[in-house]
Amino acid sequence: MSEKEKKDLSQECEELKEKYRELEEYAKRLKAEYENYREEVAREKRELIKNANEYLISRLIPILDDFERALNQKDHEESFYEGVKLIYKKLLNTLEKEGLSKIQVGETFDPFEYEAVERVETDDVEEYTVLEVLESGYKFHGKVLKPAKVKVAVRPRKKDEESPDKKE
């Protein structure tokens, strides 16, 4: 084998090694892209399932509200009451396992979690204090699905504020 043939074979071998390294790098990039794609698809699937559950649970909340109203009635037969109470607890427990939670009522009105349906003028408590929950509110995985309907304390209006059009 001549020197030139050896040199040509050596050069060809180096070119093939370089091509091999390029193909190896390309395969690694493809593998990484594929793994990223799989993770993204799995994340989208989880989000789709979560959104479907959110839709279903938001449709079940009115049933919870009806149960609460029935349970708050004073005059009904004890066995009926206990049955409704049991169903309510089971339904609430099932929904909580899926990510539903009741909005806990704090002391100060939060417009992101409460809907003020009634304002009560009073000096007895601090302004914007939640006085009473009229209807429970719910979150699903931290997102408010239904705000709690509440009575909120406001400062009494002064006499001259009550009728601004009566100024002379």
Curated annotation (Swiss-Prot):
It is found in: Cytoplasm. Keywords: Chaperone, Cytoplasm, Stress response. Gene3D superfamilies: 3.90.20.20, Head domain of nucleotide exchange factor GrpE. The keyword Chaperone applies. Its main location: cytoplasm. It comes from the Bacteria. One of its GO terms (cellular component) is cytoplasm. One of its GO terms (molecular function) is protein homodimerization activity. One of its GO terms (biological process) is protein folding. Belongs to the GrpE family. PANTHER family: GRPE PROTEIN, GRPE PROTEIN HOMOLOG, MITOCHONDRIAL. Participates actively in the response to hyperosmotic and heat shock by preventing the aggregation of stress-denatured proteins, in association with DnaK and GrpE. It is the nucleotide exchange factor for DnaK and may function as a thermosensor. Unfolded proteins bind initially to DnaJ; upon interaction with the DnaJ-bound protein, DnaK hydrolyzes its bound ATP, resulting in the formation of a stable complex. GrpE releases ADP from DnaK; ATP binding to DnaK triggers the release of the substrate protein, thus completing the reaction cycle. Homodimer. This is Protein GrpE. It comes from Thermotoga neapolitana (strain ATCC 49049 / DSM 4359 / NBRC 107923 / NS-E). The lineage of its organism: Bacteria, Thermotogati, Thermotogota, Thermotogae, Thermotogales.
